[in-house]
């Protein structure tokens, strides 16, 4: 009898604990939900589609969005890049840091400044390596880099040199523009290759990017560039509010020339008043802790402005 009594008490306690735990979870969920839905006002929390313009432009060339296919392709890129908020905020911040340097080179090379957005979608403005082996901001393959005069070996990889790789991209884009008569097709060729674009033009008897049936990646390519261009140029229109103080600051640097080997980059950096990390951030194309340079080639090194 006594054991039965205590057994009932134990069951009652377990039931009470379960009720209390359920209540706590319910309240916690309600609080979390309320906080997520903008301070409890659920009517203020909405996700909206993006208004698609009737026309978009890239490098001074207009694309009229007058077909369902074109509208849906443009809509996809606007939606993906608007609602992948964390990535797009990073892209906007990095654009503030690197675009001034890239724009100067594009202008100097006679290439429309809209092409800075090509680098943005290629790499996110990071020195990344693709599964196929393309490297740097402009995602240059080893064969292409060497063809256009970049030094690429175990000691130096100039695909990571922003100045030289941007100038290479400009040479390629101008060559493609001369071949196809269109900056838009030049951008497509940067992704698909000039031969690939030429084959599509000949097989389909079309000369406008938007009228050519490309594979999935290339058919998205220019529309992705255009979407990021619109978002970065007018972030508030897409719901991105970033204070100027939160932007990544442009790099201020000067250049020095060197035509001899560097036996130890750590010591070399220290002599300039830098640590190894900061020196390599500005000169990522130097792959090792030394520079061979037996040929006495003239290299250009980037040094923080306050260290000159």
Where in the sequence are the language-model features?
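An acidic, Gly/Ser/Thr/Pro-rich helix-cap/linker signature
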Residues: 2-110
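Solvent-exposed, acidic/flexible segments
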Residues: 84, 88-99, 108-111, 130-138, ...
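Short, functionally critical alpha-helical segments immediately adjacent to catalytic or ligand/cofactor-binding
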Residues: 111-126, 186-192, 280-282
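Substrate-binding/active-site groove segments that recognize
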Residues: 133-154, 166-168, 173, 197-200
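Catalytic and binding regions of secreted/periplasmic enzymes and modules that target cell-wall glycans
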Residues: 173-200
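Catalytic cores of secreted or luminal carbohydrate-active enzymes
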Residues: 216-239
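Primarily a LysM-type cell-wall glycan-binding module
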Residues: 244-273
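Extracellular LysM carbohydrate-binding repeats and other cell-envelope/extracellular binding modules
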Residues: 282-308
